């Protein structure tokens, strides 16, 4: 099963609230925890943000996150412009920033779903407030060549979680 609003259309993505994403991952981890003795949660990008949220809520044994996008490279646009315009301009054409070969492996939408991006911003703000609740051993992976996530996210996470092993 896909995360609500994902893997279908920009319109589906735009129609989804961040609370639906939280409910989905909570329900799935609760099901998994009934079958497992230990829980290791791994997430990349938005999945990393959702993994952080889960680790703030559930007794996770180990957490691995990569390229979390709690703060965006285009922070001003995401934090101030998108909340103002997302109801009027619901999608924006993507500018291809990847090389030809890298783009062939990319399977996302051709447009940024701006209403969903605004929900992602809300998810990030909510998750940042919960970082102190994370106590499990945590590995954070971030590439210096990352084109989407800023490296300051590493410090944001590692300086705010309560884990002794990071």
What are these regions (language model features)?
Residues 1-10:
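Conserved alpha/beta-hydrolase
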Residues 9-35:
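Catalytic nucleophile-loop/oxyanion-hole region of alpha/beta-hydrolase
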Residues 43-47, 51:
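Gly/Ala-rich beta-loop-alpha elbow adjacent to hydrolase catalytic centers
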Residues 64-74:
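Active-site nucleophile loop of the alpha/beta-hydrolase fold
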Residues 113-130, 136:
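Active-site nucleophile elbow and catalytic-triad environment of alpha/beta-hydrolase enzymes
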Residues 133-134, 140-142, 146:
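Short beta-strand/loop motif that positions the catalytic acidic residue
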Residues 136, 150-159:
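Short alpha-helix in the alpha/beta-hydrolase fold that links the catalytic acid
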